[in-house]
UniProtKB/Swiss-Prot annotation:
Disulfide bonds: none annotated. Keywords: Competence. It comes from Aliivibrio fischeri (strain ATCC 700601 / ES114) (Vibrio fischeri). This is DNA transformation protein TfoX1. Induction: By chitin oligosaccharides, but not with polymeric chitin or chitin monomers. One of its GO terms (biological process) is establishment of competence for transformation. Pfam families: TfoX_C, TfoX_N. Belongs to the Sxy/TfoX family. Transmembrane segments: none annotated. Required for DNA transformation jointly with TfoY (tfoX2).
Amino acid sequence: MTGTGDVNLKIKEIEMSHLEERFFNFVKKLGRFNKRSMFGGVGLFNEDAMFSLVTDGRLYVRGGGEVDARFEELGCERFKHVKKTTIATVNYFDVTELFEKKPASLLSIVQEAMENSRLEREFKKSKENRRLRDLPNMQLTLERMVKKAGVPDVDSFLEIGAVDVFKKVNHTYGGDVDVKLLWKFAGAESGVHWTLLQEPAKQALLQQV
């Protein structure tokens, strides 16, 4: 029985290896990329911006902007990163079946994901020279609210993330904060106006609050 189990494990490892290799060759069509260890798997980076993840025999591509809605329409699920005591859902979508069955439809999505990740990295690199009120959707009033909640600057805001910033503000102001602030913080984090957030993205944010 053990021998059969070992053989099955070997076969699975070979299949996973072939899948990864085919995906890497697929992504090469869009330009050069680097590989680094991430989340127990391999992260794919273009110009130091991560746009894809390969782990446990599954392929994931980064969401963001209008790409989220396309992933939702195609039935792709978000990557769940299992930590010691919690499960964190991050904005990477499982494209394994899509890659196997409809690779042509995936190519433009991966290209857009690469571009989005580069733009966000550039945005985050420029954060050192920005005030909270300089971020999209933020003004002096919101800057004061966020600082009162214990988030002193842009660097901290982006590191903590929109959901947890909202939680802090909501707690500080007695749990009676307009949910629009969550959209505004999410837009500020992504570098877009909050009205551009798609409904699936809003629902995903709400589920984390």
